[in-house]
Amino acid sequence: MKTGKRITALLCSVLLLAFLVSCNTLALAEEVPELNWTDLVTEEIEAQGAFQKIEISDSLSIQLWIPAEMISVDTSFMDGPFKPVALYGTEDQARSVILFVSEVSSLDEYVALMEKEGGGSNFNSIIINGVECISYDVEKDNILSLIYPVSDHMVLSVNCMPMDADENWEITRNIILSSIHPAE
C-alpha cells in the first residue's frame, strides 16, 4: 500500500514538474498558464478522492475534487456576509480548502478589493479548465487563493491553507484547483 502511495506521489511530482516547466515556458512567451484536470490527473489519483458538488445559486453549481483525507466541515453555525459555501479539512486541521461566493460588479473591481482590503499580493492570471481565473497570495494568513468567475457578476473564491506547506500538499492543492468545473 505504501509503495502505491509513493508511486502516486512520484507521478504527481513528475506531472507538477512538467506543469511548472510549461508555466515557465509560457511566462517567457507572456501567455497565461493553464491547469486542466485531464492533463494533470490519472485515474489512480482521481480514485484517491471524490468530486463534491457545490451549490452556488438555485440554477448554478460547480464541482471540485476533494482528496479522501479531507472531510466536509459543517458551516451552518457560521453567520455573516463571509459565510463559506463549503469547507473541507484534514482531521488534524493542518490543511483546508474554504470556498466563498461573492457578488461582484466586475472581476477587476473584485481583484482591486482583494488587493486593498483582503491583503492579497502576487496576482496572476491562470486558466482552469478553460476558465480565466486569478490566483493570489494572502501571505499574512498563509493562504493561496483562486478567484473563479462563475457568472458575469459572481465569483467563487477558493482559499487553500496553508500556502507554504510541504510538496505533497502543493501537489494536492494543484490537483484540487485543476478539478474545478461547472456541474452537469
Regions picked out by a protein language model, each given a short descriptive name:
Residues S57-Q63, E91-S96, E139-N142, H153:
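Glycine-centered tight beta-turn/hairpin loop motif at sheet-sheet or coil-to-beta transitions
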Residues A112-V155:
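Signature of long, low-cysteine stretches enriched in small and polar/charged residues
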Residues V104-S106, K140-N142, M154-V155, P162-E167:
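Solvent-exposed loop/turn segments at secondary-structure junctions
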Residues S72, L99, S135, L156-N159:
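Short hydrophobic/aromatic-rich beta-strand segments that constitute the beta-sheet cores
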Residues E43, A50-S59, A86-T90, N124-I128, ...:
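Short acidic-hydrophobic surface loop/beta-edge motif
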Residues V85-E109:
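A short acidic-to-branched-hydrophobic micro-motif
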Residues K2-C12, F19-F82, C160-E184:
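N-terminal targeting sequences that direct proteins away from the cytosol to non-cytosolic compartments
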Residues W37, F82-K83, A94, Y110, ...:
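Short, surface-exposed coil-to-beta transition loops
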